[in-house]
Regions:
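Positively charged n-region of N-terminal signal peptides that target proteins for export
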Residues: 1-6
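Hydrophobic alpha-helical transmembrane segments of integral membrane proteins
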Residues: 9-10
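C-terminal motif of bacterial Sec signal peptides marking the signal peptidase cleavage site
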Residues: 18-20
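Conserved functional acidic sites
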Residues: 24-232
């Protein structure tokens, strides 16, 4: 039943893309760094990332644009290797700021997070972006605050699958705080991640400082290829 539901979820943006959008050239961003962000295409693309430190763990990012009464925006859905959706980011195409952020708990219940700071991708490379969102915690009565502060480090040519591509490299300071509003107690964990955004692709690689976690883009799948994987 869950896989049928996922299949219908995957099918909907394809139908919207056919009837609601003409082609990818309909969408342009005012962000001067948009070439290094995800393609603004109404036809969904699925990025398969593999954890090269272990060679086993996979993660899928499903990327597509839609247009509604609020205008065009880009959706990035994050899936675990078993097909469970984990979170989804909704970006405004003009600025590439976040419009919405959705989280999914272990029971696959979706929650629209409360967005405090909406910048994950910079308009200008000399700015430090700040993303902050609050949502329900794993334990009853707790809430979680997720933050990412991103700083541009350098531009380089980087290997993306089999080709060298111009790439923006960022340092991401990531902080997750668990808050109990009744006891006023909080517990925070912080880490630093290095992220790589390549021209024409968007996010192609990320790793922790010690590279114990290290994901790299391995393949770009079509919608049909993705459906075969997720429903088999």
């Amino acid at each position: 039943m869950m896989r049928l539901g996922v299949f219908l979820l995957l099918l909907l943006p394809t139908v919207l893309g056919i009837y609601g959008c003409s082609n990818a050239s309909d969408y342009t961003s005012e962000n001067p760094n948009a070439a290094f962000f995800y393609p603004l295409d109404s036809i969904p693309k699925i990025y398969l990332y593999r954890d090269v430190s272990s060679g086993l763990d996979e993660e899928f990012h499903r990327i597509y644009t839609v247009k509604d009464q609020e205008g065009p925006h880009l959706i990035v859905e994050i899936y675990a290797s078993d097909g469970r959706i984990k979170e989804a980011f909704n970006y405004n195409i003009d600025s590439l700021n976040l419009q919405d952020y959705m989280v999914v708990d272990v029971n696959q219940e979706k929650e629209k997070a409360l967005l405090y700071k909406d910048k994950l991708f910079p308009m200008h490379l000399n700015e430090r972006t700040w993303f902050a969102a609050k949502f329900k915690g794993v334990v009853d009565s707790t809430v979680m605050l997720s933050e990412v502060k991103r700083q541009f480090k350098r531009k380089e040519n980087h290997l993306v699958m089999e080709d060298e591509e111009p790439t923006l490299v960022f340092s991401d300071l990531m902080r997750l705080t668990v808050l109990n509003p009744f006891t006023k107690k909080e517990e925070a964990k912080q880490t630093t991640r290095i992220s790589y955004f390549a021209d024409g692709y968007g996010l192609v690689e990320w790793h922790s400082i010690n590279k114990k976690v290290h994901y790299r883009l391995e393949q770009v799948l079509t919608q049909q290829e993705w459906i075969k994987i997720i429903t088999r």
